[in-house]
Amino acid sequence: MNEMTHRTKTRPVKVGNLTIGGNNELIIQSMTTTKTHDVEATVAEIKRLEEAGCQVVRVAVPDERAADAIADIKKQINIPLVADIHFDYRLALKAIEGGIDKVRINPGNIGRRHKVEAVVNAAKERGIPIRIGVNAGSLERHILEKYGYPTADGMVESALHHIKILEDLDFHDIIVSMKASDVNLAIEAYEKAARAFDYPLHLGITESGTLFAGTVKSAAGLGAILNKGIGNTLRISLSADPVEEVKVARELLKSFGLASNAATLISCPTCGRIEIDLISIANEVEEYISTLQVPIKVAVLGCAVNGPGEAREADIGIAGARGEGLLFRKGQVVRKVPEETMVEELKKEIDVIAAEMAAEREKEKETQEQ
C-alpha cells in the first residue's frame, strides 16, 4: 500500500493570491446561494462570507448569463472566485476569460477531447487551476457497473481517470475532492486518495443536512479526515445560510489547532454553583470575537474557585462570582471587576490583546519579506 500523503507534502497550487497545498494551512471555502447572474445579490452574499472568514468562494455557472457576470463580480470582491461548471465547456472558457481564479469541472463530462483541451489550454494560459470534483452520487456508469454501488475504490478510480485526462495534456495545477454524504465512505475515499496521488484535497461531506444535523455530521466526518493529516481546503455543506458554513469550518479547524487566524472561546458547561448568567455572557462574547483574525483564546467561566485554573491557557478571561468577576490572563488574576461591568472590561482587554497580536503578526510578515 502506498504511503499516505500528508497535507504538508501535497503539491502547491496557486488559487488567486493563495497557495493551496504544500503547507499545514487549511483554506475555508463556501458557495453562494444566489443566482450568479444577479451580480448585486451575489456580491452582497460574498461580502458577508468574507467578513465571516471565508477565504475562497464558489459560484454556480449553469448558463451564459452566469458566466458573463464573473468579471463584474470579480471586480467587487477580495477573495478568490471559483466557477462550478458542468457539461458545457464554453461556460468554462467564458468564466476563465472573465477572470475566474479556479474552475471546478469533471473532465469526463465536458465531452470530446478537443473540448477538454480547450479548457486546459485556457486555464494554462491564465495560470488557473482545475478542481476535479468526484462525488459518490454521480460516479460514471462503468464504475458503478464494475463495483455495483458507490465505493471508495470506485471514487479513487474516477479521480485517477480524470487526473490522467489532464496530465495527458501536460496540466498539473489540479485539486481533487472526493465527496460523499455517507461519512464512513467519505473518510475511506479521502484516505485512499491521499495514498493514490499527491494533489491537494478539498474536503467536504456533501448533502450533510440542516444547520444542526449537518454540523454534527460534517464535524464527525471531516474531523476524522483532518486528524489523519489529510486535506488542504474544506467546505462545510449545510442547508443553511452559507455564513453558517464558514462559522462551523472555523470552529472545526480551531479544534485541531489548524486555524491561526481565528479566536477561540473557552466556556464551562454550567452547574449549580453558577451565580451569573453565564450562558448569555458566553454567547455575547462569542459573537464579539467571531470576526477577529488573530488566534486569541478567551475564557468565560462561572466559578471563581476553579475558573482560572481550568483556563490557564487562555490569553484573557473572566470567572464570575456573586456580584463580581475575576479578570485573569494566562491563569493569573489581574483584578476584580463588578458583575455589571465585567463583560465590557473583558471586551476592552480582548481589544488590547488582539491589537498586540495583529501588530506582532505584521512585524513577522515584514521580517519574512526582507
Curated annotation (Swiss-Prot):
Pathway where this protein functions: Isoprenoid biosynthesis; isopentenyl diphosphate biosynthesis via DXP pathway; isopentenyl diphosphate from 1-deoxy-D-xylulose 5-phosphate: step 5/6
Q: Which cofactor does it need?
A: [4Fe-4S] cluster
**Superkingdom of the organism of origin:** Bacteria
The protein's UniProt keywords, in alphabetical order, are: 4Fe-4S, Iron, Iron-sulfur, Isoprene biosynthesis, Metal-binding, Oxidoreductase
Q: Where are the transmembrane segments?
A: none
Molecular-function annotations in GO: 4 iron, 4 sulfur cluster binding; 4-hydroxy-3-methylbut-2-en-1-yl diphosphate synthase activity (ferredoxin); 4-hydroxy-3-methylbut-2-enyl-diphosphate synthase activity (flavodoxin); iron ion binding
GO BP terms: isopentenyl diphosphate biosynthetic process, methylerythritol 4-phosphate pathway; terpenoid biosynthetic process
| Iron-sulfur is among the record's keywords | yes
Checking NCBIfam families in the record gives: ispG_gcpE (TIGR00612), PRK00366.1 (NF001540)
Name of the protein described by the UniProt record: 4-hydroxy-3-methylbut-2-en-1-yl diphosphate synthase (flavodoxin)
Species the sequence originates in:
Bacillus cereus (strain ATCC 14579 / DSM 31 / CCUG 7414 / JCM 2152 / NBRC 15305 / NCIMB 9373 / NCTC 2599 / NRRL B-3711)
The organism's taxonomy opens as: Bacteria, Bacillati, Bacillota, Bacilli, Bacillales
